[in-house]
Amino acid sequence: MTRTTVLGTRALGRAALARQSLLDRSDVPVLDAVAHLGGLQAQEPQEPFVGLWSRLRAFDPAALSDLLTGRHVVRTHLMRRTVHLVTADDALAWRARHNAMLRQRVLGTYRRELDGVDLDELAAAGRAVMADGEPRSMGELARAVAGRWPEPGPRALGEMLIAALLPTAQMPPRGLWRTRAGVRNVLLSSWLGREIDPLPPDGSGPDGSGPDGSGPAGSDPVGQALVRRYLAAFGPAASADLRAWCGLAGLPAAVAAMREELVTFRDERGRELLDLPDAPRPDPDTPAPVRFLPAFDNAVLGYHDRGRIIDDAHRGLSVTGARLVLVDGRTAATWTVEDGTVRVAPLRGFSRSERAAVAEEGRALAAFLSEDDSDRVEVEAAP
């Protein structure tokens, strides 16, 4: 029997940083970076700009704004039912695979309010309203159909329509660089001029099982593509990590169908880790530069076991919207911006060299965020 290689926390952390372009900034075009990362969480509209600045050399925020207005990337509800900034191609290819999960997650919040509502009829009514191509807020769409379904209330109707039943895109100017704008939604097909890709007729159900979720599984080709893309940007990783990233139930049929093309490891807890054979797995002692992460960055949220990036004691920071600072590849501080000054709050003591490196990267971030009006940074005393 061949013994499976065990990868320690530091080795997994360095692999994650390498895949995420956080170990060494990349020179790839912005669109390619968004595609490689499988999108960026974007519920806070300005955060993807910081995420890409930390990953790309000479990142020009205007390039991302141009991709949004040019309809090459879109802001849409997708993984985990959260707003993600993804390429137009990925939005169309992946949306149908996420439909069942999106419905279930909204029902998990509004099951009582939506009891008795025929969701297919609600979807048809919402689509009819949106067919004119006019951008609408969630509330406007909900009120347009509320006469037929008065009981659920506009919030439940709007969430189900915008976040689940109708593939929609959030229109610019929301999401443009240094721009504040409310959410206005249009049908994804209207905005991109293409319908979403239908699921292949291979028998796969919503979670990669049989058509009813319990019978024989198909090969789930869309799921296989998701697995490959996830491992390229996040691996090595367990099935639970994959589910934490996308919200889908582990993609068991997809993983089973492609096992022969994957390699396996184990972590120190004994979990099986899957990976692409030729993906980078740097030496655990590879130096890791200071990096500033935006709120809700998938480098942290894209795992069930986030221990490769953040200590269990600080795990709660990753889901409350705290912006994190990585020192030696691990979460060591949080950061905010006040009046053009980047303020860093350490979670542990820094050596003199670490403090200097944090200050240097913080000055560069302040200059980026202010378009060179300020390079002020303040590093607070350690707790």
Predicted features along the sequence, with ranges:
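Long, low-complexity intrinsically disordered regions
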Residues: 1-306, 312-383
